Design a protein with these regions (language model features):
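N-terminal secretory signal peptides that target proteins for export/translocation
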Residues: 1-5
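Pocket-lining segment of extracytoplasmic ligand-binding domains
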Residues: 95, 162-169, 174-271
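Secondary-structure end/capping motifs
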Residues: 230-319
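Predominant activation on well-ordered alpha-helical scaffold segments within soluble catalytic domains
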Residues: 48, 97, 151, 197, ...
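Sec/Tat signal peptide C-region and signal peptidase I cleavage site
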Residues: 22-29
Length: 359
């Protein structure tokens, strides 16, 4: 049968439509895939909205990759990152040092998201104070910033000599609220919002210390394995997730209703509760603010406190004989510790690229 020109043109169009859809899908099936772990926290909940809104997919598509975000309990997210089950993870500066870095997993912070400015707190019952805490059971997620906050509170309240008498009860963040509230014999707990707010609904509980007393010491980061970041695909991932992050937080900072609604929903919170948490989260809502902090002397000063805490508490790994054995590298080329043993790196390049509109 002879094909006339109009029908031939229609056939060509049909083939273009078929192959135009099939080919990209086939390419996407082979696209590099990256998984980001996150856990419930005011400064990390935006990853949920980022995925829900399509912002993440838009940026991943731009760089020809697939990015998945997966929610974890906090300690489990760190374990998964150390085990190399995920490629990137939200974590604090201290945990970046005492978990992956201490375990020998060379890691790089590419986004400095915020610092806790009252989100982390020490809460007690029965009128306890730092002077009467020693010997009492204290519920917290051990080897995290909760333990750091507790010690800083003790030191700043003149109780450094009593540190060895603290009795710590390791409790998962997913269990800590119910475990504390359902047993009145539990007298002290250290955790973060929204868990702090939930515990504080008990009128017998009051706060004796929070992270606003130590501004900039508890940082919330996105950390990527350095071996991944050193590959072309890993660099595309870093650009995509950074671009998606700053588009997301710009909406959050502007009060965009869906940004707040879904970020609140990420932790089963109300919008009002989430807004209250944001008040005690010093969010670096622009890449310039984040890059400026990441390249400032203040970061190195804060990290020096953190690394000394980690070493004193044996959190830098077995056989570590000096605080310098797990070194930290900064954007200006400075290194705290042995230059041959750098395991944690702060890289401002992607934040700066976002600032310059080059992502």
């Amino acid at each position: 049968m002879k094909v006339t020109k109009p029908r031939f043109f229609s056939l060509i169009c049909a083939l273009c439509l078929v192959f135009g859809t099939v080919v990209p899908l086939a390419a996407r099936a082979d696209a590099p895939t990256f998984t980001v772990g996150w856990s419930v926290y005011a400064g990390w909940n935006p990853y949920f909205y980022m995925q829900k809104s399509g912002i993440l997919k838009k940026w991943a598509d731009k760089y020809g990759i697939v990015i998945k975000v997966q929610r974890f309990d906090y300690a489990t997210s760190l374990d998964s990152f150390v085990a190399k089950s995920i490629d990137a993870c939200t974590m604090t500066n201290m945990d970046a040092l005492d978990m992956p870095a201490a375990a020998g997993v060379d890691s790089t912070a590419i986004i400095v998201g915020d610092y806790s400015n009252g989100n982390d707190a020490v809460l007690v019952r029965n009128g306890l104070s730092f002077g009467t805490l020693p010997g009492k059971p204290i519920m917290l997620v051990q080897k995290t910033v909760s333990e750091y906050l507790l010690e800083r509170g003790m030191v700043l309240n003149g109780q450094q000599a009593q540190l060895s008498k603290l009795r710590l009860i390791n409790t998962s963040d997913s269990d800590i609220v119910a475990a504390f509230l359902n047993n009145k014999s539990n007298q002290a707990v250290v955790t973060w919002k929204p868990l702090v707010s939930q515990i504080a609904t008990d009128k017998s509980v009051h706060e004796i210390f929070d992270s606003s007393k130590i501004p900039g010491e508890i940082l919330d980061l996105l950390v990527v394995r350095t071996d991944i970041l050193n590959t072309p695909d890993g660099q595309r991932f870093a650009k995509a997730i950074t671009g998606a992050w700053y588009e997301t937080v710009a909406q959050l900072a502007a009060g965009q209703p869906n940004a707040i609604k879904y970020s609140a929903a990420a932790s089963d919170d109300t919008v009002d509760s989430y807004k209250e948490q944001l008040k005690t989260t010093a969010l670096f809502s622009t890449p310039k603010a984040a890059a400026d902090f990441a390249t400032s002397p203040a970061l190195q000063q804060k990290m020096d406190l953190v690394r000394k805490f980690c070493f004193t508490h044996g959190l830098l790994g077995q056989g570590v004989k000096s605080v310098d054995d797990v070194a930290i590298a900064y954007p200006n080329g400075a290194v705290q510790g042995d230059k041959g043993r750098v395991r944690l790196r702060f890289n401002a390049a992607y934040m700066q690229a976002a600032q310059q509109g080059k992502l």
